[in-house]
Amino acid sequence: MSDYKSTLNLPETGFPMRGDLAKREPGMLARWTDDDLYGIIRAAKKGKKTFILHDGPPYANGSIHIGHSVNKILKDIIIKSKGLSGYDSPYVPGWDCHGLPIELKVEQEYGKPGEKFTAAEFRAKCREYAATQVDGQRKDFIRLGVLGDWSHPYLTMDFKTEANIIRALGKIIGNGHLHKGAKPVHWCVDCRSALAEAEVEYYDKTSPSIDVAFQAVDQDALKTKFGVSNVNGPISLVIWTTTPWTLPANRAISIAPDFDYALVQIDGQAVILAKDLVESVMQRIGVSDYTILGTVKGAELELLRFTHPFMDFDVPAILGDHVTLDAGTGAVHTAPGHGPDDYVIGQKYGLETANPVGPDGTYLPGTYPTLDGVNVFKANDIVIALLQEKGALLHVEKMQHSYPCCWRHKTPIIFRATPQWFVSMDQKGLRAQSLKEIKGVQWIPDWGQARIESMVANRPDWCISRQRTWGVPMSLFVHKDTEELHPRTLELMEEVAKRVEVDGIQAWWDLDAKEILGDEADQYVKVPDTLDVWFDSGSTHSSVVDVRPEFAGHAADMYLEGSDQHRGWFMSSLMISTAMKGKAPYRQVLTHGFTVDGQGRKMSKSIGNTVSPQDVMNKLGADILRLWVASTDYTGEMAVSDEILKRAADSYRRIRNTARFLLANLNGFDPAKDMVKPEEMVVLDRWAVGCAKAAQEDILKAYEAYDFHEVVQRLMRFCSVEMGSFYLDIIKDRQYTAKADSVARRSCQTALYHIAEALVRWMAPILSFTADEVWGYLPGEREKYVFTGEWYEGLFGLADSEAMNDAFWDELLKVRGEVNKVIEQARADKKVGGSLEAAVTLYAEPELAAKLTALGDELRFVLLTSGATVADYNDAPADAQQSEVLKGLKVALSKAEGEKCPRCWHYTQDVGKVAEHAEICGRCVSNVAGDGEKRKFA
């Protein structure tokens, strides 16, 4: 028997079947770096319309975790897809470098500032530590395949950025938004510092819940108010609190003006409570025998005075809108030094903002004999004992509730009034303007808008001062006596900023006030406070975006971070930008959910359910991680586990195999000379290119909408259904057996070429390494990298007016599916081995029959059978299989007649009819020795 293998056009490519991503990706990265791929992209995109995604800076501390990977990969997908869409989209990664976590790390190794090192040396150590952390994280981010200006990132500790942060504060002061006050702020006794809203987390905590009686100073006045004369025992107003330790700072009792308050007689005394809460309070304190003596509106009780249960003063009843009937007694213990609501109402009534608690969380000397020097969290029992001793405690019980804790120490925090600097939300209309700006931003998902609106509407003034060593100094001078800011504050801040730009923040602490204040230096003191780190990152729209040359003065189009950043970076950026410029710093804000394990549980080292991105990249490769990120709906929680990553690897193999099939069958194809014009192509090939065109429209729309899981689903559908189970199957016969340079084969290769050109670009934003690899194997002249180009524009499709249009082939797909079912059953019944051993008769109603007949002898190639005949539906024999999908179709199968051709494997009657090629069929003889077969349709 002759060997006809050499006459076949067998697929061939150097593109490997196995990805071996973990091994290959580092080599690709090295090439990207050596070539300066990021620089090549920037040069290619110069002059295009811009799209600026401003990087929210991760904190320069510790290794990157899976959440960091999600964030950076999503950003990279957007940047690359925007590049392919014709934008110049520079990406400048950044890091947050000041603040407490770095201080704590340095303290652990070197001690607190002033112990072994001066404050200046301590800052230098912090800077050194942050730099090493940046280097470690940068390597991992690059390994993810994220393209950016990694050689020139922005760091909030860059001297120029530090200077620009000071300038941002100057602008806010110039616009009248800064004020100083002894306001209660979140205070961590372990950090010994104020905390920003975003540094507070909530955990369940068990606290004592107490009902306390404040006895009326003027008993007769109360009797008159309630219209009663006979009351058995003293009258008291009852408060309820879960923070007994704050009672030494009590300066009032808040009640609601419109609530009805009842005077209730119980055993030996009378108590005042909100009428609607009488029943629940009586149950709580264990009193079943009580009488309501009278009721009045809360407004009637305003400014009546009540004796503090153990301190030597009395306090007024005041009216507040914050009082509710949700719990308690309807009367709220008010300590202006320990709560924001209390502070606001205290200001209204001119109450003292008492703060008897020191920075370490212990009571200051002179607070109360048994409390001085005691930690507030240990003081509850002492306070409760005092109340019991004074006869003021009506009830005590334990309750579990959500309590604010320090994000760093996980320990409970307190509200503590300290002299601080604030950005005011209302004195110059910052709140109103911010709410207006929010409406002009596109929030993705859209629920983000309501979330941040609620936060802005209800947030207190922003405390921006910190009592820390490693941070950007506020750079302010205040008068020794009046504590007023220097009248030339803005000018002085610019002078400080210039020095910081040269020498870093240490320039402020080294500065002798006389150098810039001259003779006034004796009258002013330098403010020792540093800025909240959220001010550092929140001002990067000004300190970075406005000044980096690659952004060319354009504002950021997008901020993209985790959903916790509504109260973090999105908020601080909005506040600062609106306070500085009167407008939001972004046009779009996209948020992603947190990563959870396969069971939906929060990731935790203690549970052992964390997934290390480094491990995934070392085992499976970064492209698998990128594909998992893209295929997961980021608007909710993002589940990841070994099993989920394995599924991503399976999907990857399907895409890789499709790409490999395309490349292997483009062997020997030179698009410059072998391309077939669309009008001369086989109809099925034009249909396949049209499928790619339709897929591209969907994929580009999904990229534009940031629906990356939709991109992946559409890509998978294209590879698996439209190509894998239909087109690529059908063309194997023509591709392998037709004459190498025939129109039939070149038409097919032309289609594969167009499809490959489109596919490699669809993949590029997500499967960046694999797309780069595919790009290197594609035929034809091209730029060195897929990332410098744009979406492929060479796709075309069938016109609706053509007889064999898309609808025609969609119906053929269904017919093919029905035939496959019949063949599978015949194989199961051992009637045939493979589909080429079968011949089918399609009994079809006239309309469908006409379509099938139009394909002539080429129908069998579509059905992958050796024979295919069309007959009248009504002539179908009893054993013909009725289609469930196409009502006007029945399928009958028989074994194909004739012999099997060893070259094309089809069974035909003309095998051996040509003496010179006695072993092969007539079609193969034509392809081997003649002009080659002609294909028109398939």
From Swiss-Prot:
Catalyzes the attachment of isoleucine to tRNA(Ile). As IleRS can inadvertently accommodate and process structurally similar amino acids such as valine, to avoid such errors it has two additional distinct tRNA(Ile)-dependent editing activities. One activity is designated as 'pretransfer' editing and involves the hydrolysis of activated Val-AMP. The other activity is designated 'posttransfer' editing and involves deacylation of mischarged Val-tRNA(Ile). It comes from Escherichia coli O6:H1 (strain CFT073 / ATCC 700928 / UPEC). InterPro entries: aa-tRNA-synth_I_CS (IPR001412), aa-tRNA-synth_Ia (IPR002300), Anticodon_Ile_BEm (IPR033708), Ile-tRNA-ligase (IPR002301), Ile-tRNA-ligase_type1 (IPR023585), Ile-tRNA_ligase (IPR050081), M/V/L/I-tRNA-synth_anticd-bd (IPR013155), Rossmann-like_a/b/a_fold (IPR014729). Gene3D superfamilies: 1.10.730.20, HUPs, Valyl/Leucyl/Isoleucyl-tRNA synthetase, editing domain. Keywords: Acetylation, Aminoacyl-tRNA synthetase, ATP-binding, Cytoplasm, Ligase, Metal-binding, Nucleotide-binding, Protein biosynthesis, Zinc. The lineage of its organism: Bacteria, Pseudomonadati, Pseudomonadota, Gammaproteobacteria, Enterobacterales. ATP binds at residue 605. This is Isoleucine--tRNA ligase. IleRS has two distinct active sites: one for aminoacylation and one for editing. The misactivated valine is translocated from the active site to the editing site, which sterically excludes the correctly activated isoleucine. The single editing site contains two valyl binding pockets, one specific for each substrate (Val-AMP or Val-tRNA(Ile)). Signal peptide: none annotated. GO terms for biological process: isoleucyl-tRNA aminoacylation. A motif ('HIGH' region) lies at residues 58-68. Its main location: cytoplasm.
